[in-house]
UniProtKB/Swiss-Prot annotation:
Keywords: ATP-binding, Cytoplasm, Kinase, Magnesium, Metal-binding, Nucleotide-binding, Transferase. Pathway: Metabolic intermediate biosynthesis; acetyl-CoA biosynthesis; acetyl-CoA from acetate: step 1/2. Coiled coil: none annotated. Mg(2+) binds at N7, E386. This is Acetate kinase. One of its GO terms (cellular component) is cytoplasm. It comes from Thermotoga maritima (strain ATCC 43589 / DSM 3109 / JCM 10099 / NBRC 100826 / MSB8). Substrate binds at R90.
């Protein structure tokens, strides 16, 4: 079975074509700057990279170019579009309705649209990708895989906010959590590496990228996560503030005379590492490099960043009444021995012992255990693979309906 995985953003479509037998990526790429001047397709087959400059006014045109490239004589990897058996889509928000991945039909499309106010930047773009695929590949099943679904096992005590309950009833304001597909993939993979059953383990997964979140995965089910009603809550991120006294935005708005939308943009786009570093960078690589060269302010930014992660790990160890493994993933989690070492230095009370050499070596796509053999809690690095998880779900659902 061949599955086309699509991640449709507001001005881009990322894609991978995966041969499910052997789980091999045949090609991948991105159509970027959709609806903006300078749009193009970057298409990769193995180590080869091809760039096609083309005007892409909308998502349908972008997907059309992607599909044409897949069957192109020179650049293609298949002879006919009929070789695509199914399409798997990343959908950011499934609200309370979707607890697992689903086959897309008219009812599902309507439901995704209904929860769009909860993810106004993402869901409408995800929908455009689904609708384009349904139009351009008629008869091919489409599956929606939700970022929020894995977190739907979180109990009420962890997802309800201490605000008037009527706001939950009226507007469904609660903790939803994000990065669910990544947390699900790395917790499952960590159990495989440890040679244990996922259902027997208490795992804390740390998805640390430009956006970042921690999840408590108890016996295979998520019981808490750091992102909340939106992806703004929790850890210090590239440009997002993470946890904040709710009175602070009101105070700033009053003092600066700014609107709620402007305040929202500040918290989402100008805060986090970028805000703390006084606009120096939102990229942790730049912060680490400056800190290593002796920049005292960047050292402090690093400390704030790592301290918040460690605090959440400690909290989730308490939430699960113990922890067997801690997993680092995503851009920073997979490639920053500095952050991993600093975070783990706070966790010695849990019995965490890091193997310095393994920590230094496990970067750039490598996976493995980076704690010492006598560490009470195992620490792992697992490169995330959300596309593969989407493809697996798609295959499973399509096989069930016997397509």
């Amino acid at each position: 079975m061949r599955v086309l995985v699509i991640n449709s953003g507001s001005s881009s479509i990322k894609y991978q074509l995966i041969e499910m037998e052997g789980e091999k990526v045949l090609c991948k790429g991105i159509a970027e700057r959709i609806g903006i001047e300078g749009s193009r397709l970057v298409h990769r087959v193995g180590d080869e990279k091809h760039v096609i400059e083309r005007e892409l006014p909308d998502h349908e045109e972008a997907l059309k170019l992607i599909l044409n490239t897949l069957v192109d004589e020179k650049l293609g990897v298949i002879k006919d579009l009929k070789e695509i058996d199914a399409v798997g889509h990343r959908v950011v928000h499934g609200g309370e309705r979707f607890k697992e991945s689903v086959l897309v039909d008219e009812e599902v499309l309507k439901a995704i649209e209904e929860v769009s106010p909860l993810a106004p930047l993402h869901n409408p773009a995800n929908l455009m990708g689904i609708k384009a695929a349904m139009k351009l590949l008629p008869g091919v099943p489409n599956v929606a895989v939700f970022d929020t679904a894995f977190h739907q096992t979180i109990p009420q005590k962890a997802y309800l906010y201490a605000i008037p309950y009527e706001y939950y009833e009226k507007y469904k304001i609660r903790r939803y959590g994000f990065h669910g597909t990544s947390h699900r993939y790395v917790s499952k993979r960590a159990a495989e590496i440890l040679g244990k059953k996922l259902e027997e383990l208490k795992i804390i997964t740390c998805h640390i990228g430009n956006g970042a979140s921690v999840a408590a995965v108890k016996y295979g089910k998520c019981v808490d996560t750091s992102m909340g009603f939106t992806p703004l809550e929790g850890l210090v991120m590239g440009t997002r503030s993470g946890d904040l006294d709710p009175a602070i935005p009101f105070f700033i708005m009053e003092k600066e005379g700014i609107s709620p939308q402007e305040m929202y943009d500040i918290l989402n786009k100008k805060s986090g590492v970028y805000g703390l570093s006084k606009g120096f960078s939102s990229d942790m690589r730049d912060i680490e490099e400056a800190a290593l060269k002796g920049d005292e302010w960047c050292k402090l930014v690093l400390e704030i960043y790592d301290y918040r992660i460690a605090k959440y790990i400690g909290a989730y160890a308490a939430a699960m009444n113990g922890v067997d493994a801690i997993v680092f993933t995503a851009g920073v989690g997979e490639n920053s021995p500095i952050t991993r070492e600093d975070v783990c230095s706070y966790l010695e009370f849990l019995g965490v012992k890091l193997d310095k050499q393994k920590n230094e070596e496990t970067i750039r796509g490598k996976e493995g255990i980076i704690s010492t053999p006598d560490s009470r809690v195992k620490v792992l690095v697992v490169p995330t693979n959300e596309e593969l998880m989407i493809a697996r779900d798609t295959k499973e659902i399509v096989e069930k309906i016997g397509r």
